[in-house]
């Protein structure tokens, strides 16, 4: 009896739909078409009695999707002629007023099966209206409700998830150049984020009414969209909206926790990374994630391992958010201590330092300093032994680095570590030039907000540390003093209105006179008179250039004295003046001086500073020798033999220099000559010999010969790799300046052999110098000579460059290797392109 009654109740719906489809498939009258559609429209929407509700549910469950597919299939030129604008609105309403999930699937599937036609245009129009009216929120909400059922249709939900997450890609493939703006990723994903917020708002209202809800499908949508690389478009709208909602509402806070917790593990990484990058601070990150880092092993791995140790692209704000989030709750602080120990181990490792690039080391240093700033005294005390061990080994490794930026970074971190270990002691202190990076590193010790767990340690005495209370008093006092000064000034006479004489450029007069002879300078350099020494060092380089013949007599002796003289802090710019004097001597008498310097470079009992000074002098002297001589007559040829006159000749200014009479005559002739057309005048280059070419071998070959000889106090292939790196760069400079020199090919062959021996050096600074040397050889030695005299070396070098460009851990090494490969290819093409 009950079964037959059920059949009678269900039969009318299926019969009506079947008859309507049969009639619509062969209809030719527009009015009748509208009547048939209206007869089926009654099954959409809510009904008043239970019978109509059952019919409505039956239609939605069994007949809605097939009927929509039939409507799409029938849409063509014939139906378009029968349907007016009002009738087309009725056709659209079947998609816009029925179950949103089924309508969305039918529209998306129809787009994939339909080519350019009226049917495609109509489906696109309906889908555009579907999105603009916010129906995506209804799709997500209906799927969320279906997941509460005992037997949810997982295949259907997976299909809807794929269509929602990749809708812009599907529409771009279907419409190509005729795509609509609403389907663009930059417009669609913010719209999707708004729909997710609407769904969460419905869930919030339902929870307040005591209803059971699920948001797992919304989490899946967020996860899959982020997995496809659209975190920025989605989360840039979703995260700020959630931030404003979770501030004072505990229900919204729990919804946010569940939203992130329900993301599948395979999509958790892009979601967490996107939230960390978008989160405005640690407090909001804690409100959004809760204790997810403790509950979910995947999230814990991401936040405590991968994002801190395996990646280095996060900005410092994101790092502060991650570590600050771990410090905000007692249940998570043990992870912060664990991270600190692991960071100390990584930072102090010599292997990590050698095989990591500067951005990676900067990332580790930032994480370490942020952790130090977030830990309290008790936690620091528990890690004190680890801090001491890491400080000792790490500081030594960083100080041995040949890269100045890395060495400076290690000094900053070592200083901060020592001060945190013993806040009352003196701590470590290094001398280095502060730049923006060092200031940023030091600022990381102070968290952006004072957290509850370590407030007692971060701020010892707010009244003393805060300048806000003392500033108003100081400002008021300065104002009173300014008023008093102004009143006293008004009482003075009018003579004080005159502008004071500018004495900013005045210099202090020295009692000692500048020496006039080179030998007098040597005596002063050997004495202990600081004032005479300062005067002598100021004019020594100029005096050497003015008295070349006298300088050549004592060039080696003067070089020896300047090389061994101790730094004089009391003499202003002493290091710069000493370097200028050494360069002037080397330029004046290059062969003996270069032989002495290159010989002393490998001698005993020289400090690293002296050896590096030798390299600087050689490179600067080679640069000066390769430049053209001035067209002015030399000071020594103008001198009459008196010392005072030679001194005067070296201090001529440009205005006092005698004018070139030929140039004056040519200008007068040009001014009195009338020309109807005149091109741009180009001065004729004056040929001049390159003084460096004649002495290049004396600077280059002695320096490259004994690099593998180990001395008790000097080991280039061992611990003194900083000097080795500087020497390699100096050799590259000497090679580059030898362009067009007869000896360039011999220098290039020797330098290629030198590079081949050291190509696998562990220090990145040395490898950078070797790659620089390769480029200088390619630029200085003609390609024909390279392929004739050293073809085998060039081929081996090319394969090595390709390997470095692909596998080297240092970014600069890879860049230099690519430059070398491009240069080789360009030189080869130039040769092949010539007739």
Swiss-Prot record:
UniProt entry keywords in alphabetical sequence: Chromosome, Cytoplasm, Membrane, Nucleus, Telomere
Position of the signal peptide: none
Subcellular location: Cytoplasm; Membrane; Nucleus; Chromosome, Telomere
Pfam families assigned: TELO2_ARM, Telomere_reg-2
Gene Ontology MF term list: Hsp90 protein binding; telomeric DNA binding
InterPro entries assigned to the protein according to its UniProt record, in alphabetical order: ARM-type_fold (IPR016024), TEL2_C_sf (IPR038528), TEL2_Regulation (IPR051970), Telomere_length_regulation_dom (IPR019337)
Top-level division of the source organism's lineage: Eukaryota
Nucleus is among the record's keywords: yes
Biased composition (Low complexity): 464-473
Family under the similarity heading: Belongs to the TEL2 family.
Protein name per the record: Telomere length regulation protein TEL2 homolog
Gene: telo2
